Amino acid sequence: MGKLIDIPIVVESGQKYKTSQGVTAIKDGIKSSGQDHERLPKPKWLRIVNHTTPAYSQVKEQVQKHRLATVCEEAKCPNISECWSHGTATIMLMGAVCTRACRFCSVDTGNPHGWLDAEEPENTAETVALMNLDYVVLTSVNRDDLPDGGANHYAKTIRAIKKRSPRTKVEALTPDFQGSERDVAVLLDSGLDVFAQNVETVERLTHPVRDNRAGYQQTLNVLAFAKKYRPDVLTKTSLMLGLGETDEEIIRTMDDLRAHHVDILTLGQYLQPTKNHLPIARYVTPETFSELRQIGLKKGFFEVASGPLVRSSYRADRVFKRDNLGLDV
């Protein structure tokens, strides 16, 4: 076992370190393999334009002031400057260390041993109120170390937001809670508007892409239960493309999702976060994303956000309103 590195020393990707809470974690989630896969050249349509506006600075200030983790930062989202410049952010609950190690994800992994910030629900609600958000997305790391997977913490946060900002729509992009319907029900009873859980990839690639504790059918079952338990709550999921799936498998996955009553689908290009993560198998063209969106709409999804830089929570407020995203994503 390598020597642990204490913050604030810069930690290289794949190294172990200790967080400020004393949790041992692996930076960016995947141990360093010492190998570097040859990368495909990035196509011109994936050029990211950085935005710097006063709104960007305001969001960053609020996030830092209230010690909030955002998936925008932790998952190295390519849209961070655009979304923050529009005054919106996806807030990540329950810390920045995940108990799982999916091979596409750059969130740090480890075992928090039950640690939770008891002030986080109220801090999050205060931040949402100060930012005067019409729509907020909450997500989190997986917390298999907690008996309920963090469902009650999620629910407390949503109730706190709704109490301070009753008009704010709340979307929760959650872990799978190991398939526990009881834990999912706790969250669904909190007053949220959209329940999201990501299937991430096609069934054939689930094992090599996701942590072994995740499952394609398990995710489908949780989404189906959410819709059955609370028909008034929209259900949503996301697929990354470019991991080695075929177009036929994508369409088959759409059929599986509709059979489990999923309302909203997002499709985006997988981007390799570090050399230790899964390599990109292909870059999907904007034209293909557009075609897949139309196929999804014909299959009955309320909305399909589909484009190279689309992520689970990208333009979530517009998706919620079914605001015909078109081809500009």
Curated annotation (Swiss-Prot):
It is found in: Cytoplasm. It comes from Legionella pneumophila (strain Lens). The keyword Iron-sulfur applies. Its cofactor is [4Fe-4S] cluster. Pfam families: Radical_SAM (PF04055). It catalyses: [[Fe-S] cluster scaffold protein carrying a second [4Fe-4S](2+) cluster] + N(6)-octanoyl-L-lysyl-[protein] + 2 oxidized [2Fe-2S]-[ferredoxin] + 2 S-adenosyl-L-methionine + 4 H(+) = [[Fe-S] cluster scaffold protein] + N(6)-[(R)-dihydrolipoyl]-L-lysyl-[protein] + 4 Fe(3+) + 2 hydrogen sulfide + 2 5'-deoxyadenosine + 2 L-methionine + 2 reduced [2Fe-2S]-[ferredoxin]. [4Fe-4S] cluster 2 binds at C98, C102, C105. HAMAP family: Lipoyl_synth. CDD domains: Radical_SAM. Belongs to the radical SAM superfamily. Lipoyl synthase family. PANTHER family: LIPOYL SYNTHASE, LIPOYL SYNTHASE, MITOCHONDRIAL. Pathway: Protein modification; protein lipoylation via endogenous pathway; protein N(6)-(lipoyl)lysine from octanoyl-[acyl-carrier-protein]: step 2/2. Its main location: cytoplasm. GO terms for cellular component: cytoplasm. Gene3D superfamilies: Aldolase class I. SMART domains: Elp3. GO terms for molecular function: 4 iron, 4 sulfur cluster binding; lipoate synthase activity; metal ion binding. Keywords: 4Fe-4S, Cytoplasm, Iron, Iron-sulfur, Metal-binding, S-adenosyl-L-methionine, Transferase. [4Fe-4S] cluster 1 binds at C72, C77, C83, S313. The keyword Cytoplasm applies. Binds 2 [4Fe-4S] clusters per subunit. One cluster is coordinated with 3 cysteines and an exchangeable S-adenosyl-L-methionine. Its EC number is 2.8.1.8. Residues 83-303 form the Radical SAM core domain. This is Lipoyl synthase.
